[in-house]
């Protein structure tokens, strides 16, 4: 079944962007997933094609109108998760990307200006999603990141399923260090265990490295990893 991505945006020319390259681009050409953009401005209600207005109660900037967004959303089938890219939303992680990859598709709403009228979130039951604790110019960049995280997990996109399962976050840990030729680079060699041919020793080394890196760099992840490990 083809994964269908639909993006509501004021800048459809930003898509597919980098998703037209590499693995995601190949999968798009092969029909593993599809991408449709919806120009929000097409659903404006006045001759000026206005999509925003001043915030109620005063304040800086402009707010995207609920009625315009509702018309744009209602023009699309309601057959997949409806997500609003928002810095106050649920933080994207690998587990969430994997759960979305199991669905039939996603409909993404890209905000601009100071955000969107809260009533559209309530009325159309949009789930807010964030890619990190920082502010972007609009939701389009975040939508591209989210789609990249999803698409690479779709069946048939990645050539090596084992590789995907060994990546950072898949088992709750950061990925272990990787090495390849040349054997020596500027005086630095490859850890001997990796060229020993002893598969169990290599697996143990990689696990130890992953745990050590996670403990040093992401103590929050390491605490969760230990908690989950104690349950099993």
UniProtKB/Swiss-Prot annotation:
EC number: 2.1.1.228
SUPFAM superfamilies: alpha/beta knot (SSF75217)
One cellular component (GO) term of this entry: cytosol
Subcellular location: Cytoplasm
Predominant subcellular localization, coarse grouping: cytoplasm
Reactions catalysed: guanosine(37) in tRNA + S-adenosyl-L-methionine = N(1)-methylguanosine(37) in tRNA + S-adenosyl-L-homocysteine + H(+)
InterPro entries: Alpha/beta_knot_MTases (IPR029028), tRNA_m1G_MeTrfase_C_sf (IPR023148), tRNA_m1G_MeTrfase_TrmD (IPR002649), tRNA_m1G_MTases_N (IPR029026), tRNA_MeTrfase_TRMD/TRM10 (IPR016009)
Entry keywords, A to Z: Cytoplasm, Methyltransferase, S-adenosyl-L-methionine, Transferase, tRNA processing
Residues the record lists as binding S-adenosyl-L-methionine: 111, 131-136
A family per Pfam: tRNA_m1G_MT
Gene3D superfamilies, per database record: 3.40.1280.10, tRNA(m1g37)methyltransferase, domain 2
GO molecular function annotations of the record: tRNA (guanine(37)-N1)-methyltransferase activity
GO BP of this protein: tRNA N1-guanine methylation
Subunit composition and interactions: Homodimer.
Similarity remark: Belongs to the RNA methyltransferase TrmD family.
Function noted in UniProt: Specifically methylates guanosine-37 in various tRNAs.
Name used for this protein in its record: tRNA (guanine-N(1)-)-methyltransferase
Originating organism: Bartonella henselae (strain ATCC 49882 / DSM 28221 / CCUG 30454 / Houston 1)
């Amino acid at each position: 079944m083809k994964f269908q991505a639909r993006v509501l945006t004021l800048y459809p020319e930003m898509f597919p962007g980098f998703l037209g390259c590499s693995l995601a681009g190949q999968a798009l050409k092969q029909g593993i997933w599809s991408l449709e953009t919806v120009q929000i401005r097409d659903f404006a209600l006045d001759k000026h094609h206005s999509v925003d207005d001043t915030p109620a109660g005063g304040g800086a900037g402009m707010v995207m109108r609920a009625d315009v967004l509702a018309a744009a959303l209602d023009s699309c089938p309601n057959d997949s998760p409806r997500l609003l890219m928002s810095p106050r939303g649920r933080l994207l992680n690998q587990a969430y990307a994997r759960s979305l990859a199991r669905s039939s598709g996603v409909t993404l709403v890209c905000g601009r200006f100071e955000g969107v009228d809260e009533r559209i979130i309530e009325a159309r039951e949009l789930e807010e999603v964030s890619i990190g604790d920082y502010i972007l110019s609009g939701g389009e960049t975040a939508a591209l990141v989210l789609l990249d995280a999803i698409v690479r997990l779709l069946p048939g996109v990645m050539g090596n399923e084992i590789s995907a399962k060994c990546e950072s976050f898949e088992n709750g840990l950061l990925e272990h260090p990787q090495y390849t030729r040349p054997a020596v680079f500027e005086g630095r060699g490859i850890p001997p265990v990796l060229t020993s041919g002893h598969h169990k020793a290599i697996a143990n080394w990689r696990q130890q490295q992953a745990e050590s890196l996670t403990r040093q760099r992401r103590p929050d992840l390491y605490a969760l990893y230990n908690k989950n490990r104690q349950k099993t």
